[in-house]
Design a protein with these regions (language model features):
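Short acidic-hydrophobic, aromatic-tinged amphipathic segments that line or gate anion-handling sites
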Residues: 17-25
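Active-site loops and adjacent core secondary-structure elements that bind or stabilize anionic groups
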Residues: 24, 30-241, 245, 263-266, ...
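Conserved structured catalytic cores and adjacent interaction surfaces
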Residues: 1-12, 16
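Extended, well-ordered alpha-helical scaffold/bundle regions in very large, multi-domain proteins
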Residues: 269-288, 292
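A glycine-rich beta-turn/hairpin centered on an aromatic-Pro dipeptide
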Residues: 288-315, 320
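Charged, low-complexity helical/coil segments in non-catalytic cytosolic or luminal regions
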Residues: 251-263
Length: 341
């Protein structure tokens, strides 16, 4: 993940100003500090703020130019769930993963995103032979493999999660999920209102007369705080950052591995030769997995409903803050759909 550097230029309370910049690479921090603390620091801070104002104005312009249709019209254009055939799962209820094997998640790591986090954009494994980025990419990759082996062999991180399949039905743009006590929880979904596009909502992929939905919450961040603090105490900030990035990638890989298990063993709609990890990372399988906070369902508060459905805080080390952020931060929470589309 990029590192945030905040520089506060102190003056009187009336003239206090703040410049906030983004460093994609750790080594860029020194360059930013040198400019901020140098004789032209004020000019640099002013340039940062001017660039950010230009970005805000461009974002606002794009929003104004979006051709949206009224929500009532978008709902009339919905494809509906009538064509959707519910898939009855083999097993319902919860499945707890108290200590998922890192080795089982490792094949699902998307290394392209790992390199992007270091500012090395390119597809893995081709980036390792890139004429300009290859040398640095190979070094970072070797360091990542060494630390990943330690994480796996010394059990430095614990992968924990809960997933389950529950009865569900759609009602307009909402998904209603029935918990173990027969109570319905309402999950409001957004609907695409862009003119000329499919005005879909996630609720369209759940049948109104009865269906099933998967829920999950998982993390690869148990133990990361202690591991990073140990590295920093030894003056090894690089390894602390590396551990954080690997925990992020392992969380996504863990989610892919659990989704594969759900499709084949719990839901049972995936048969025959399973997708390879490479195919799974590219989403080449039936069904979909989505996490809250992304465009299809940006409402983080829905995590509370899923946490309660799965009894996440009673069975794992994950906690949900009052602002609906998951602790540890290297975590995912969302829904799974069996729809063939």
């Amino acid at each position: 993940q990029p590192l945030w550097l905040r520089y506060v230029r102190y003056g009187s309370l009336e003239t206090l100003t703040v410049a906030l910049t983004l460093a994609l690479l750790a080594q860029q921090l020194l360059q930013i500090l040198a400019q901020l603390l140098g004789p032209d620091g004020d000019l640099y801070a002013d340039k940062v703020k001017a660039d950010q104002q230009a970005l805000r104005e461009e974002y606002a312009r794009r929003l104004r130019e979006r051709d949206l249709i009224p929500i009532a019209e978008a709902r009339r254009a919905r494809r509906g769930a009538a064509q959707h055939e519910p898939v009855v799962p083999l097993h319902t209820g919860r499945m707890v993963f108290p200590d998922f094997d890192v080795a089982d998640a490792e094949p699902y790591i998307d290394w392209s995103f790992f390199f992007a986090a270091w500012g090395l954009k390119g597809r893995y494994p081709e980036i390792l032979d890139h004429p300009e980025k290859g040398a640095e990419a190979r070094k970072v990759f070797a360091d990542a493999q060494a630390l990943l082996a330690r994480i796996r062999d010394e059990r430095l991180l614990t992968l924990q999660g809960v997933a389950g399949i529950f009865p569900a039905r759609s009602e307009g743009d909402d998904i209603l999920v029935t918990d173990a006590k027969g109570r319905e929880k309402r999950l409001p979904m957004l609907r695409n209102q862009t003119r000329g596009e499919e005005n879909l909502s996630l609720a369209d992929f759940i049948a109104p007369d009865g269906d099933w939905i998967g829920c999950f919450a998982l993390t690869a961040g148990i133990g990361l705080k202690e591991l990073a603090e140990k590295f920093r105490a030894g003056g090894d900030d690089y390894s602390a950052i590396m551990a954080k990035l690997l925990a992020d990638r392992l969380t996504e890989a863990f989610a892919e591995a659990v989704h594969a298990f759900m499709r084949r063993e719990m839901w049972g709609y995936e048969t025959g030769t399973p997708p390879t990890p490479e195919q799974a990372v590219r989403g080449q399988y039936r069904g979909r997995r989505m996490a809250f906070g992304y465009p299809a369902s940006p409402d983080h508060s829905l995590k509370r409903e899923v946490f309660d459905l799965l009894s996440v805080e009673m069975t794992t080390g994950m906690k949900l803050t009052e602002n609906y952020m998951i602790d540890p931060g290297e975590a995912l929470c969302g829904l799974m759909f069996a729809d063939a589309d």
